[in-house]
Each structure stands twice: as structure tokens, then as C-alpha cells.
Amino acid sequence: MASSSSPIFLMIIFSMWLLFSYSESTEYLVRDSENSWKVNFPSRDALNRWVTRHQLTIHDTIDVVDEDDCNTEIRSKLGGDFVVTKRPLVLPPLITLPLSPSPAPAPSLSGAAAGHGFIVWLGASLPMLMFLIWL
């Protein structure tokens, strides 16, 4: 019984490795949600190859930034153009969920609901572990 579970376990591990290694995104969203377009890259190294072909280095000016548009304190003066060396990192949310129509209270970590996520995980993983041992 125990010897037959080893090939199945290895097959599951190998299939998970294949799933994770080939499930990366090759389509990137550029700009904000209003003025956006998608860029497709044929491989994971396409962006690195593009950068090495154009030989970009630190402090290269890709486009000129006005002083009024720049909201940072650190600037360097290179030949008449301002080059932004540091900007605050503001990322838009990847997923925007609609608000709930009902006046439901917000979930909290205190009270009776604390720890239920671990119990659900334990309840789902224990039968799977027992199944793999049984094989």
C-alpha cells in the first residue's frame, strides 16, 4: 500500500510544478484604468531583452517632466531637463470589488470568527493527507 502512494505523490508534485512554472502572465496593463492598453510579451525575458537592446541606465530621460507635474523633492539637473529620481509609490488596486448592498458589518479578527480559517484549512487538508497515506 505504501509503495503505490509514492508514484502518485510524485506525479501530483510534478503536475503542480508544471502548473506553477507555465502559469505566469505575458500580458501587461500599461497606464491607469481610463487610458490603458495591453502589451503582450512572447516570453518572460522579452522585457529584459528590450532594455538591453536600448541600453538604458539609471538617470536616463525617457520623457521630460515639468516641475509642476512632479510631486517629489529629489531632482537632478542634467542638461536642462529635470529627471525624476524618486517618486512616491502609488499603485492602483488590481481588483475593485463592488460594495455590498446590505448593511452587513465588516469582518473582524476578534470574537467568535477568529481562527475559523485555520479550521477550514485543516478540515480540507487532513482528508487529502489521509487519502494520500491510504494509497
Swiss-Prot record:
The keyword Signal applies. The keyword Disulfide bond does not apply. This is Early nodulin-5. It comes from Pisum sativum. Keywords: Nodulation, Signal. Invasion zone and early symbiotic zone. The gene is ENOD5. Involved in the infection process during the plant-rhizobium interaction. Residues 1-23 form the signal peptide. One of its GO terms (biological process) is nodulation.
